Amino acid sequence: MKLIHVLAALPFIGILLGIPFANKVTPYVFGMPFILAYIVMWALLTSALMAIVYVLDKENKKEEAE
């Protein structure tokens, strides 16, 4: 499996499998319940990971060269 496929799958795995473990309210992160902070963190990480996938993907470089 290529690195870009693993990077693209990380947000899906993190959100899907991490929610049962992060399902807590008591620790507050920046004034938000932990579960909400966890989802916001993954939304930001997803954007960063997709940017990395875009940069690493060789197909995008072919389109820019044309």
UniProtKB/Swiss-Prot annotation:
Q: According to its UniProt record, where is this protein located?
A: Cell membrane
What protein name is recorded for this chain? Uncharacterized membrane protein YhjC
Topology versus the membrane:
Multi-pass membrane protein
Keyword S-adenosyl-L-methionine listed? The answer is no
- Which top-rank group of organisms is this from? Bacteria
Main localization, broad class: membrane
Q: Where do transmembrane segments lie in this chain?
A: 3-23, 34-54
Q: Would I find Transmembrane among this entry's keywords?
A: yes
Q: Which InterPro entries match?
A: DUF3311
Annotated Gene Ontology cellular components are: plasma membrane
Q: Name one Pfam family in it.
A: DUF3311
Query: What keywords would UniProt list here?
Result: Cell membrane, Membrane, Transmembrane, Transmembrane helix
